[in-house]
Amino acid sequence: MAGMDQVAFDGGSVGFRVSPDEFLRAPQFAAARDEVIEGKLSLYEGSHLFNRLILEEGRLLCHLAALSLHAAQDMAKPATWLTLGRLQREVTELGVASRNRVEAQVSCLRRYGFLTQQPHASDRRVRLLVPNEALLARDAGVLGVLLNGLALFGLSPPAGQPGAPDATLHRALRRATLPRLPALSRLIRRHLPLAPFFAHDCGYMILLLLLRGARQNGDGGIATGYQWLAMQTGVSRTHVRRLLEAARSAGLLTMETRGGHDIRLAPAMWQAADRWFADQLAFMDLLLREALTT
């Protein structure tokens, strides 16, 4: 698998105001990274259904596209409405999912009540997709975690309030996300070393649990094992084992005993994770600055 530095990516094409490398070099970085890990786990732990519906690259981008289109739509302009067709066009242009896969994810989100499909008031032939309050609140919570991380660098909304953004800032952040979705897709894809986690159901959750476990043990061994990780994430023990074996093959961790009771994260894992979180912070900083100026 290609190393991080081998992945061709022009960070300047994203238009970062503060580069990921600047975040990495900052003395506050480790504390901000750990704050983001803890914050995301506080949102994800125990939410097995939601995590399986969202925490995988293609599903994540489809989910973000829906939220961004919802925030950016203008009811006076039909071309901006969040419909299934509009969402399919947006996501397929990113190259992360087919039209059928987008429709399948929308069906799942509707089945569990995270999305509803409602006729437009003036043209009942048009069916609008509408995120429910739980989906919007979860998204605001995720943004709040990253905003809290930025606050450690002195980069936060003018009000400086911790936690999730209010409804106005939330909409502005997701409106700013919409034109940046192609850049976000490229940003995710440049993290090839973390592909074993990003490409599997709940892999991102498992990554966060491993990082937290290693920090709690002074970067020593993690004795949780496959079964505990499976119970925490709502996937099978076999799924966890295969994911961790793929991560071991990629040089991200070591395991010596049966059952995954002696997982140790390799330096390559920390390097890859740090670059991932630096990218997240830089992207969030960009969205925040754009949201506050529109």
Indicate residue ranges for each PLM-predicted region.
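Compact recognition or signaling/catalytic modules
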Residues: 247-253, 257, 263-270, 274-276
